């Protein structure tokens, strides 16, 4: 499988290497839950390969995600602190995340969002990002999807061990093993990360260090019952403990900067796949249990919660002819949460179908419909249409792509419960489901030598957006109008001469809430500019990435300062199987703010070694 890194062309490099192939042949799964070559996909997708993930070397997955077009990340004070991953300017809780098919959303969270701050990069083999309203396959509330795949087994036995250390007394160790034969295969990973961190809050005069520990275990076991039937089990356990400032004792309400956040998520999935002739069937059941506890100077604080998510899914495909494929499925889910004061549970049923057709040999279209029945908010029907048209241009192809999608989001269990215990005006409000729609139009030019250029315009909006009352803190209110997000994504990947390659993206994002004001913490302009140099066969490689964010405002409407952050990565294959690697994050020691009141990491160097067998 060839590597694809989506990025924008700030400049089209001359001296393009004569080596490489068209990147339109890369196989993508996230768009329609079935493998499809990029050339046939009309939606906007990007991917990070195993090589790219390892070379960049970041400890947390959100650090990798922020290098991609259309993705903005805000972090509140270092590793393990709350981090929002926004796709195309939408709220972080509209971003859905899956690991080996497991939905890792937390029903006890404010709006049932994934806890990205506890999601580490160790053991991750591939990440695919689907941008825009994507409710068809993943639930009508999905405003973007991040599909994460861990390392898979191959014939025989293989593995790796890795250790790294660096600034803030940070250390990371991990191990991966995989093996199998024609009948049985397995893969397992274990990783431990520790850091003393830095002072997370700018107003904490004690200047204490807020550390974080994370232990992540992940395993998968597969059994080929017959040539057509496969059984697979996935299980994971994540435990995180972080220090932070500015918390309150739940009994005395005393303020403290000695605060602890304990997090644990246990999840598993069992799946059965059957393929025969023109039909395939996938039936799966997954369960996750997420628990969060907060302490102030050793005593209970606020924000505790436990959430459980059960999901039963069926996906089928029928290849009706050489040019026509049908995808259909069922999605049954139960959300439950308990915060110690109240507990709630809700069921939702979803049914969907999508037509995929190849017309005129170079026109690929999809048309899908989804029906959801929410226990509290009734039935909703949503749609998705997409198309990709290919034509030869020079020594390559141009793809004209377009997509349109709709969705809805029912108020979360937390939002409903908060309003029931709040006060006017929120307590007097009957929250309704949000509705969304969006479209994008784009051009892609992919040359046979590896040059990849993409330009996409997107426009999407949310009707009746739910938001927290920051004026009176009464609870959750509902906007009487549309919140909008539109803009342009530019992407470029170019092999250059003398071992150099260019990797860049730029996003312009114009957002407004239902009052016409810019939405908070969404930079109008984001860019990543990466340059990498590697020797023949990549015995040694070094890369530089510059990340910039401009024209953002805070929740008060106050402008946030623009910034640029420079990261450096290097990797040296000493002998077969042994790599020494290092990186410097924030090379220029930029003093920048993502969320007012919270500090960001200064210049930090890390060194490590990896042995593969």
Task: Cite the ranges covered by each PLM segment.
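Structural signature of Gram-negative outer-membrane beta-barrels, strongest in the C-terminal barrel
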Residues: 223-226, 236, 273, 319-327, ...
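N-terminal periplasmic accessory domains that precede
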Residues: 61-64, 83-86, 95-98, 114-119, ...
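Short acidic/polar hinge/loop motifs at secondary-structure boundaries
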Residues: 103-131, 428-430
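Outer-membrane beta-barrel signature, preferentially recognizing the C-terminal barrel domain
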Residues: 250-275, 305-308, 344, 399, ...
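Periplasmic-side early beta-strands and strand-to-turn transitions of outer-membrane beta-barrels
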Residues: 145-149, 153-157, 164-168, 176-263
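Conserved C-terminal beta-signal and adjacent last beta-strands/turns
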Residues: 4-7, 178-179, 189, 215, ...
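Gram-negative outer-membrane beta-barrel transporters
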Residues: 327, 358-365, 453, 458-461, ...
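Extracytoplasmic beta-strand/coil segments of soluble accessory domains associated
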Residues: 62, 66-103, 125
């Amino acid at each position: 499988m060839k590597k694809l890194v989506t990025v924008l062309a700030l400049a089209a490099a001359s001296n393009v290497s004569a080596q490489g192939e068209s990147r339109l042949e890369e196989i993508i799964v996230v768009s329609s839950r079935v493998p499809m070559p990029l050339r046939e996909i009309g939606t906007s997708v990007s991917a990070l390969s195993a090589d790219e993930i390892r070379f960049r070397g970041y400890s947390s997955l959100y650090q990798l995600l922020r290098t991609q077009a259309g993705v903005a990340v805000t972090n509140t004070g270092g590793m393990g602190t709350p981090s929002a991953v926004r796709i195309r300017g939408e709220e972080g809780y509209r971003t859905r995340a899956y690991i080996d098919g497991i939905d890792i959303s937390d029903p006890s969270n404010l709006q049932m969002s994934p806890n990205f701050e506890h999601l580490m990069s160790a053991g991750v083999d591939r990440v695919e990002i689907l941008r825009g309203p994507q409710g068809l396959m993943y639930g009508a509330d999905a405003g973007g999807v991040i599909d994460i795949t861990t390392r898979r087994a191959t014939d025989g036995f293989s593995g790796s061990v890795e250790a790294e250390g660096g600034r803030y007394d940070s250390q990371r160790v991990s191990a991966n093993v995989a093996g199998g034969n024609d009948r049985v295969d397995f893969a397992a990973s274990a990783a431990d990360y520790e850091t003393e961190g830095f002072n997370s809050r700018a107003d904490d005069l004690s200047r204490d260090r807020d550390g974080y520990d994370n232990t992540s275990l992940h395993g998968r076991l597969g059994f080929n019952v017959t040539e057509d039937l496969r059984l697979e089990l996935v299980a994971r356990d994540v435990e995180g403990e972080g220090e932070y400032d500015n918390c309150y004792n739940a009994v005395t309400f005393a303020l403290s900067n000695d605060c602890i956040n304990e997090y644990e998520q246990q999840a598993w999935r069992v799946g059965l796949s059957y393929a025969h002739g023109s039909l395939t069937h996938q039936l799966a059941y997954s369960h996750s249990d997420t628990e969060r506890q907060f302490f102030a100077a050793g005593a209970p604080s606020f924000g505790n919660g436990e959430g459980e998510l059960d999901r039963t899914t069926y996906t089928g495909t029928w290849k009706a002819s050489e040019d026509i494929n049908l995808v259909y499925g069922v999605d049954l889910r139960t959300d439950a949460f308990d915060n110690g004061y109240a507990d709630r549970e809700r069921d939702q049923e979803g049914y969907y179908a999508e037509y995929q057709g190849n017309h005129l040999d170079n026109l690929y279209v999809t048309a899908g419909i989804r029906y959801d029945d929410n226990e509290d908010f009734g039935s909703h029907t949503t749609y998705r249409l997409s198309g990709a048209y290919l034509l030869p241009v020079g020594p390559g192809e141009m793809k004209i792509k377009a997509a349109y999608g709709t969705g809805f989001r029912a108020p979360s269990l937390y939002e409903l419960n908060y309003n029931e215990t709040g006060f006017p005006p929120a307590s007097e409000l009957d929250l309704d489901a949000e509705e969304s729609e969006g479209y994008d139009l784009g051009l892609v030019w992919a040359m046979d030598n590896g040059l990849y250029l993409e330009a996409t315009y997107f426009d999407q909006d949310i009707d009746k957006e739910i938001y927290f009352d920051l004026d009176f803190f009464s609870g959750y209110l509902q906007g009487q109008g549309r919140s909008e997000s539109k803009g342009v994504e530019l992407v470029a990947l170019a092999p250059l001469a003398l071992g150099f390659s260019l990797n860049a993206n730029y996003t312009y994002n114009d957002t407004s809430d239902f009052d016409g004001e810019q939405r908070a913490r969404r930079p109008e302009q984001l860019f990543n500019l990466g340059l990498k140099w590697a020797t023949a066969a990549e015995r040694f490689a070094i890369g530089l990435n510059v990340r910039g964010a401009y024209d953002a405002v805070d929740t008060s409407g106050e402008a946030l300062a623009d910034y640029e952050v420079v990261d450096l990565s290097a990797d040296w294959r000493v002998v077969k199987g042994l790599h020494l690697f290092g990186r410097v994050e924030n090379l220029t020691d930029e003093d920048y703010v993502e969320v007012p009141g919270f500090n960001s990491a200064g210049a930090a160097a890390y060194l490590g070694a990896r042995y593969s067998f």
